[in-house]
């Protein structure tokens, strides 16, 4: 099985230290937004193969037919902290989104069968399940994601251009 079977390209993720500030600057300077902001608290957390509870802040904005995601570490230790220390702010990953929980779990199993490294993964019941996979061929991270937007709470904040939330 090919890893992207049934997946669609969902978003491009960028790591930042100040999520609200970055969203505001992108809205003001580049017209990107509005940004829907959440604190994400996975109930299952693995970092480099070991349990490691973490939370993070995420902001999403529609850009044309795609989405930009800003991520900032919040609590606990995660690959977000490591990346910021080693590389600073900037591009982090490209996301492939799967239509069902079973589909993303099969993709994660396929990644493991292929011997690829999952450096971080997390999930919360049937709301979301994600994994960051190292694709050595392009020296980059690819996120495998299932997300049920109907089960997300409303955004904690909306930053920029308009007061109505954009698509997730």
Please report, for each region that a protein language model flagged, where it lies by residue.
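Long, hydrophobic N-terminal alpha-helical segment
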Residues: 1-52
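Vicinal oxygen chelate
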Residues: 2-3, 9-17, 59-64, 69, 83-102, 108-168
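Short acidic/polar alpha-helix capping motifs at helix-coil junctions
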Residues: 20-25, 70-74, 95
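Extended intrinsically disordered, low-complexity coil regions enriched in Ser, Thr, Gly, Ala
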Residues: 20-39, 85-89, 100-124
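Surface-exposed flexible segments
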Residues: 23-29, 81-87, 154-164
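Conserved short beta-strand elements that form part of the metal-binding/catalytic scaffold
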Residues: 33-83, 128-151
